[in-house]
Amino acid sequence: GATFDISNDSSTQKVVVNFVDEDNSIVGEEAFMNPANSKEFTIGYYLSKDLGIYDLDVGFRHDQIERSGSVTEEEHDDDHGDEHGDEHGEVDYYNIDDSTNSFAVTLGRSLTDNLGISLGYASVERLPSSIELFMNGPHMATGRFEVGDPNLNSETSNNFDITFNFDNGDFYAYASFYITDVDNYIALIDEEDDHMDEDEHHEDEDDHHEEEGEHHEDEHDDHGHGNLIHANYMQEDAEFDGYEIEFGRSFDLGSGELALSFGRDVVNAEFADGHYVPRINPARNIYSLVYTQD
């Protein structure tokens, strides 16, 4: 990659060009995905300008992405499963060639000598990763039989945030609040969670579902999934909101300085139908104590 600085006296401007050619290959017993290749060409532009009482930051990025890979379909033969366990199913080859565009703008200003505020908006497109597209096999590290989808669309997220910064030398505080709407959010959904959602709408058929569940478990064993949870990469609109806060103070102590701080971050995420997005980090409290000797 290369970065070109085209700044002038009134603004900071940079152009970034980057090219990545990446091979993804998983070998051994845990070969849950066939070899895949990704080629990505990126060009980005960044501008930072002082508008008097406001500071403006703008960024734009264009990605041209090509992903190629294959998916081996499972072959099931109940009568001769042990006899032909090493045989491979039909292989389907895919080539995804697409582009994405992302844009971000932040406008900030000082309210007082110690307090600043900034408002930001970002629209980001993301093409599915090779794993999300071509995964198809047992992933022992997660205890799941994970299945990708070569027909996934790109994600598009729109984010609004507001940030406050305070610093008077000895004491500082930071708080940021955001809300993000994501179209076609890609998530790894456990099949049993999908069944649970259906059960909520068919409570009168609980016994029937239990019998089917046992039957499906037997089928999974026959298909070589063992006790692994079957999970699929799927898409659904989602909404994220949350905040990050941090504050701290420094003290002169002996021949050095003692810095104390506390931080907390919270993320809430729901799909459009009201169900929670899986695998979201729980709220965190972060405590820090650092002593620096002069």
Ranges and model annotations:
Residues G1-A122, Y174-F177, G242-S250, E257-A259:
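Face-selective signature of the C-terminal outer-membrane beta-barrel domain
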Residues G1, V17, S25-F32, S68-D77, ...:
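Outer-membrane beta-barrel translocator domains and adjoining extracellular loop/strand segments
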